[in-house]
A protein has these predicted regions:
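N-terminal basic/disordered segments at the start of proteins
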Residues: 1-26
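Broad gene-expression machinery/nucleic-acid interaction feature
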Residues: 12, 30, 129, 136-138, ...
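Dinucleotide-binding Rossmann-like beta1-alpha1 core, especially the glycine-rich loop
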Residues: 77
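Ser/Thr-glycine-rich phosphate-binding loops at phosphate-binding pockets of nucleotides
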Residues: 10-12, 120, 135-141, 206
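Short glycine-aspartate micro-motif
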Residues: 3-7, 129-133, 201
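N-terminal glycine-rich anion-binding loops that anchor highly charged ligand groups
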Residues: 24-32, 69
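Helical "lid/coupling" subdomains associated with nucleotide-phosphate turnover
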Residues: 17, 40-67, 72, 80-92, ...
Length: 303
């Protein structure tokens, strides 16, 4: 069976076409657009320009899908923080329906965390830990024990809106780094997270994968899709100014994240500090794969 899944996020809009049979999946096609929807949100409303960006991107994706063996009923579109956390959600969803002819499911923060967990557990073997998915406009957290979620929540801060709120230029200054860290710690302290002692992190999403890629560019030893918090902190210290020779590794590996990667790594470091984590296990799969396994593949197995 074939399914197309579109994830409308705060920083990126991603289209992935999968071929699947039960739990066996293969990616047939992938496209990413750096839409930066957070830039179009002011006073909790997405501007008309932002709505046009979403609609145009989705129309482009629908045109691509017409060239692929994908039927209309196998196209699934969901949105996360960029559309979930605004006052004019209904306006955006209606505009997408009228422009692109598709329905968008706006998933809650808890559901996003759960689906990210479902996807990640098909890539990482952990009995207990904390799943962390750092997006552009929010960061999802799911604490799990014995392979069951015991707590999940959504921090209303991601790598892109952290940059928007706290950073003036491209690379955050020491003062701006501290502002991001304090913002994250304040939000974490406000949550009713159970105290379970030190937990490993299962890292999901583009920010964490990009951090791991950057570690490789810097010549750090590849430890089977793992990154120590010590390595993460070393990278944060390394990128402290705007000189080209200092930021060259980011430009080489993840140029489209030049402004959001350091804020994202600071976010990850503060979450790790909160959970006393020493290592991040990098998952290849995340919320889109979780959506596929939970909503589609499971149903095909039951038929």
């Amino acid at each position: 069976m074939i399914a197309a899944i579109v994830d409308v996020g705060s920083n990126t809009i991603r289209l992935t076409v999968y071929q699947y049979e039960g739990q066996d999946t293969q990616v047939l096609f992938h496209r990413k657009t750096m839409a930066g929807l957070v830039h179009y949100i002011d006073k909790k409303r997405m501007s008309d320009a932002g709505i046009r960006v979403v609609c145009q991107t989705l129309n482009d994706y629908m045109s691509m899908l017409k060239q692929l063996p994908v039927t209309p009923d196998s196209i699934h579109v969901f949105a996360t923080a960029a559309i979930r956390n605004i006052a004019n959600t209904r306006q955006v969803v209606d505009a997408i329906r009228e422009s692109a002819g598709i329905e968008v499911e706006v998933i809650s923060g808890d559901e996003e965390a759960r689906l990210s967990y479902v996807g990640a557990m098909h890539s990482v073997e952990l009995e207990e830990g904390v799943l962390v998915d750092i997006g552009g406009g929010s960061s999802e957290i799911a604490v799990f024990q014995n392979k069951e979620i015991c707590y999940s929540d959504s921090l209303p801060i991601g790598c892109l809106n952290a940059y928007e709120k706290c950073v003036e230029k491209i690379i955050p200054s020491e003062k701006e780094r501290q502002a991001i860290a304090e913002l994250v710690q304040k939000q974490l302290q406000a949550m009713s997270i159970p105290e379970l002692g030190p937990l490993p992190i299962c890292g999901v999403g583009g920010t964490i994968r990009a951090s791991f890629k950057l570690k490789g560019v810097l010549g750090e030893t590849d430890q089977a899709n793992q990154m120590s918090i010590e390595e993460l902190q070393g990278m944060i210290r390394r990128f402290k100014n705007h000189k080209k020779k200092h930021i060259a590794p980011i430009l080489v590996k993840t140029p489209d994240r030049i402004h959001t990667l350091i804020p994202g790594m600071i976010l990850l470091n503060e979450i790790a500090r909160f959970f006393q984590s020493e290592v991040v296990h990098i998952s290849r799969f995340g919320v889109r794969e979780g959506f596929l396994y939970d909503r589609l593949a499971k149903g095909s197995e039951e038929k």
